[in-house]
């Protein structure tokens, strides 16, 4: 478990999985899924390797607070994104239930999923995705791989219903303070003084607080330094 890997804290990010739909299943869906994902899918001949299901998904959105009240900035995202490669894909955080592996990692635009290069994101202050591509081994769980394929079909009850989630381990963080509903940290006030961070940590959701300061502004945890 990640909690044993010498990090003090963990946070969870999640995102809908987008599969590459085989053309023999539905050629229109196959075309739509290719347009969305082409830049991130591993290069695999799925006709020859019909037991492999290529997938892609956003591991997290950089520079935007997640629902747990945590955020990763551009610098940390760029330092860690390649670490996802060759990691397992699990079902529901069950480490013994590995159904595939991650093979590619890159960046895409927030809201549109258009591929971005390292150069394009390096100086970005606004939100962007860290996007991963990988494979699910259909043979391990046929029912699940069918569900993943159906999740890109708007007429299916499984549409947008399969998510990947990631537990990230870290030991260091600063605080960011935002007003109202704002989730993007480009206009946040950052608190990096260790004494001040410690004084306010009980306000954080990750430590059982309400995520608010006395003046009504919202306080979040910005993950820094090494992330596993």
Predicted feature locations:
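Polar/acidic, low-complexity leader/linker segments enriched in S/T/G and N/D
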Residues: 2-98
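Intrinsically disordered, low-complexity N-terminal regions enriched in serine/proline/glycine
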Residues: 8, 27, 49, 80, ...
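Residue microenvironments linked to proteolytic maturation
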Residues: 12-13, 117-228
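Surface-exposed intrinsically disordered loops and tails
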Residues: 21, 41, 46, 114-117, ...
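Generic hydrophobic, aliphatic-rich segments that mediate packing or membrane embedding
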Residues: 85, 102-106, 128, 162
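A glycine-rich, hydrophobic loop/mini-helix early in the fold
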Residues: 91-121
